[in-house]
């Protein structure tokens, strides 16, 4: 972060971390204090004339504060709600000053790029997505945990070689990438090279690197409902499309899972998805439909079975 500050001429940085992570908070406090003691932070760092310091700010765990403008609003001491853009943070951000925001993974790459050179970093990955990506691998998989892979690695390699495959002899059914707002990727796309563009093209996204594996016993309608329940709870309520739209979508999904829906409900659900994508204020509402749209795209037969046959094909 200090390197980024030097590059753009900033003198103050903030690390925003959830208060529910006390170990992370404690370690960051120690690291910041040690950096000050070593002269890596503060006034006139190494007699360079460059001043830079870092403050730690704790968040209350709101999912919407992962959106950059809501995060800045929270750091300022206000309720974490997104702001309209423009103006963009690079022109008018934290405390009305020009601001850049990056996640920890981005900053962690900077020292290695400086030490090894940009060519080294660009030698990994794909043409448009350079370097590596860290995924949190979980779900119905033998080996769970954090895995770092070069961009362009296939989903099959992650699931079968790194993750050790699906346990108990079950078949792979889908993987959801990008956290609660990501899409579900079916087995037909197991061999697609993972990068930002490819994930978007098949209805998912990279996000911060969540990767959840599902087996043949997973009900994809239940999965869509599960993630939408989370989004409903985490919506800040500032804009109507997200505040009301997600609730209407959840009501329809509940009818479908109970065998009480009609095919007209399915059409309405899809219509609401596109409405949220187009009209929500921030990325939380814009991406909330991804789990629904991706499961409709690849597992529509399961929705129809719930509606017509009043039962779940996955059991």
Predicted features by range, described:
Residues 14-18, 48-57, 171-178, 267-268:
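Beta-strand segments within the central parallel beta-sheet cores of soluble alpha/beta enzyme folds
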Residues 2-19, 167-173, 246:
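Glycine-rich phosphate/pyrophosphate-binding loops
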Residues 25-151, 163:
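Hydrophobic alpha-helical positions that pack around
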Residues 2-4, 151-167:
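Short amphipathic, charge-patterned alpha-helical segments
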Residues 20-25, 62-65, 71, 79, ...:
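Flexible loop/turn segments at secondary-structure boundaries
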Residues 22, 139, 172-192:
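Short acidic beta-strand-loop surface patches of small beta-rich interaction domains
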Residues 11-13, 17-21, 26-48, 188-315:
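Ferredoxin-type iron-sulfur electron-transfer modules in oxidoreductases and energy-metabolism complexes
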């Amino acid at each position: 972060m200090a390197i980024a500050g030097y590059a753009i001429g900033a003198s103050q940085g903030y690390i925003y971390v959830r208060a529910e992570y006390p170990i992370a908070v404690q370690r960051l406090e120690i690291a910041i204090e040690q950096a000050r003691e070593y002269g890596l932070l503060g006034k006139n760092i190494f007699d360079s004339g460059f001043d830079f310091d870092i403050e730690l700010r704790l968040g209350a765990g709101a999912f919407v504060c992962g959106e950059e403008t809501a995060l800045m609003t929270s750091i300022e001491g206000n309720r974490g709600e997104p702001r309209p853009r423009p103006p963009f943070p690079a022109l008018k951000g934290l405390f009305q000053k020009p601001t850049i925001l990056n996640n920890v993974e981005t900053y962690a790459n900077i020292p290695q790029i400086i030490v090894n050179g940009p060519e080294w970093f660009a030698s990994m990955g794909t043409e448009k997505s350079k370097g590596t990506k860290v995924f949190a691998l979980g779900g119905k998989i033998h080996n769970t945990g954090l895995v770092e892979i070069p961009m362009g690695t296939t989903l099959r390699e992650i699931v079968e070689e790194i993750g050790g495959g699906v346990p108990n002899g079950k078949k792979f059914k889908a993987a959801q990438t990008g956290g609660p707002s990501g899409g579900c990727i079916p087995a037909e796309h197991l061999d697609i090279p993972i990068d930002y563009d490819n994930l978007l093209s098949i209805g998912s996204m990279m996000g911060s690197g969540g990767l959840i594996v599902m087996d043949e016993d997973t009900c994809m309608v239940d999965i869509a409902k599960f993630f939408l329940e989370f989004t409903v709870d985490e919506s800040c309520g500032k804009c109507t499309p997200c505040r009301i739209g997600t609730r209407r979508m959840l009501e329809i999904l509940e009818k479908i899972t109970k065998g009480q829906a009609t095919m007209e409900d399915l059409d309405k659900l899809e219509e609401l998805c596109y409405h949220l994508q187009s009209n929500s204020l921030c990325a939380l509402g814009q991406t909330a439909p991804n789990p629904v749209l991706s499961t409709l795209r690849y597992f529509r037969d399961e929705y129809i079975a719930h509606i017509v046959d009043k039962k779940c094909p996955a059991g």
